Amino acid sequence: MSKVRNSDIRSELRPSAQLLKLTYTAASETAFEKFDRQCIKKYRGKWKSRNTVAEEKAIVRSDGSILRILVVRCEDGEEENATGLLWLHDGGYAYGVPEQESLLVDMFCGDGSCVAVLPDYTKSIEAPYPAALEDCYSVL
């Protein structure tokens, strides 16, 4: 993985990037890969919610590969005209899985007024930008 120079970062994002560098001093590709494996082991396939259910589905990407997504609904069913929500899980596009967001998504979908779609997008450690963004857009 090549080193990201300050000039590679959009000027308005540079202050946040500097803060992240201080926060994640050990943010190497190896560290992100290790943390991603831990997230997958701990969360993948385990939707921990009191009010919602997650159904795993697959979307075929333009290159023929499969994009895993979760469709989250209220456990008791949803209203007929529920709001749609595209939820991108935490992890800075570098690590994590949709299932780690169950508590937060519960707040939006638990009463049946919202249905959320959570893509298990391509991580930046697997493919460079805009791979994750393209995955998320393809869900729409």
Regions found by a protein language model. Give the residues of each.
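A glycine/proline-hinged amphipathic helix-loop "lid/cap" segment
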Residues: M1-C74
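Short beta-strand element of the alpha/beta-hydrolase
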Residues: N81-G91
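Conserved catalytic-core motifs of eukaryotic protein kinase domains, centered on the activation segment
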Residues: V97-E99, P128-Y129
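Short amphipathic alpha-helix adjacent to the substrate-entry channel of hydrolases
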Residues: E99-L118, E134
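Alpha/beta-hydrolase active-site loop
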Residues: A127-L140
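Short beta-to-alpha linker loops that shape the active-site pocket of alpha/beta-hydrolase fold enzymes
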Residues: G91, D120-S124
